[in-house]
Amino acid sequence: KFSKKDMFCELTIYFDEKSSKMKAMIDTGNILKEPITKLPVIIVEKRALVQLLPNKILENTEKILGGDAETIESKYATKLKIIPFSSVGRENGILLGFKPDKVLINTEENEELINNVIIAIYNKELSRKNEYSALLGLDIFERRKENESIKTFSR
């Protein structure tokens, strides 16, 4: 049986010696992958990333996607990714993303540490009622069977 509480988890993203914690919804429709590495993508609202990324990046995602990367410090430039996507009502969209150091996912049953994932910066709100700030796909949980970079800790 699948209940509403099974649809949510807590996410902590670690990047550049900082961390940000947020509530995430598990989205069965999120099959987004970064095209070169094929890593799964977690979509995160921009406002949930203010502790992790410099304002120069967060406030200029559209400019950066358009090719204006002059404002980016080199230590961030190598971590940034461009992620093409299609969704209902929006074909050929692109999101700016980055490779975090690690992501910790807390569910009712366990805690999982994931290294191989990409975070996409979403400029709008994902939830009208601010119930969550991130969307992650089921494939992140399914990958744990074949991916040695995921560590699971039972509660």
PLM region spans:
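A short, charged
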Residues: P54-E70, L136-R155
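A broadly tuned "polar low-complexity/structure-edge" signature
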Residues: D6-F8, D27, P40, K46-R47, ...
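Canonical alpha-helical transmembrane segment with a positive-inside/aromatic-interface signature
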Residues: K1-I43, A48-Q51, N60-T61
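Aspartyl protease catalytic core from the pepsin/retropepsin fold
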Residues: C9-Y14, K18-T28, K63-I140
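A signal for specific C-terminal beta-sheet/loop modules enriched in small/flexible residues
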Residues: I36-A48, K56, K124-L136
